[in-house]
Amino acid sequence: MFQGASALTLDAKGRMSIPSRYRDALQTQAEGRVTITRHPDGCLLLFPRPEWEIFRDKVDKLPMNATWWKRIFLGNAMDVDMDGAGRVLVSPELRTAGGLAKEVTLLGMGRHFELWDAQTYTAKEQAAMAEGMPDALKDFTF
């Protein structure tokens, strides 16, 4: 399970260093192979390949009225291999789709990651905190 936030920088070629705390798990779980695609909230999703295959199968089974979401998730998906230095290349198309500049935030979200432009993530997080807890969390105990 992946968790935690990491402040990272994309290099001039659009490569991102995977934090060392995740590298071993990605090597073991997916042989360093990941898939990156778009997320409806404006960030990117980064899946270890076995988790992507599960997600892809679920998306593929969506009904016809969700065809555009199939296009968004599957049509934008790119398979990437982690290089020897533990970096993954985020394609120019996906960087544009995710609004990624140089500074990014990688969030561990359990079985996958979200990749955000750092400023966008901070703004959205602050807005969510200002709104208060949603009803679904009202009975949640810390």
From Swiss-Prot:
Matching InterPro entries: MraZ, MraZ_C, MraZ_dom, MraZ_N, MraZ_sf, SpoVT-AbrB_dom, SpoVT-AbrB_sf
Lineage: superkingdom: Bacteria
Subcellular location: Cytoplasm, Nucleoid
One GO molecular-function entry: transcription cis-regulatory region binding
Sequence similarity: Belongs to the MraZ family.
Organism phylogeny: Bacteria, Pseudomonadati, Pseudomonadota, Betaproteobacteria, Burkholderiales
One GO biological process term: negative regulation of DNA-templated transcription initiation
Protein name per its UniProtKB record: Transcriptional regulator MraZ
Oligomeric and partner information: Forms oligomers.
Keywords recorded for this protein, A-Z: Cytoplasm, DNA-binding, Repeat, Transcription, Transcription regulation
Gene Ontology cellular-component annotations: cytoplasm; nucleoid
Organism: Paraburkholderia xenovorans (strain LB400)
Pfam families referenced in this protein's UniProt entry, alphabetically: MraZ (PF02381)
Residues annotated as domain SpoVT-AbrB: 5-51, 77-120
NCBIfam families in UniProt: division/cell wall cluster transcriptional repressor MraZ (TIGR00242)
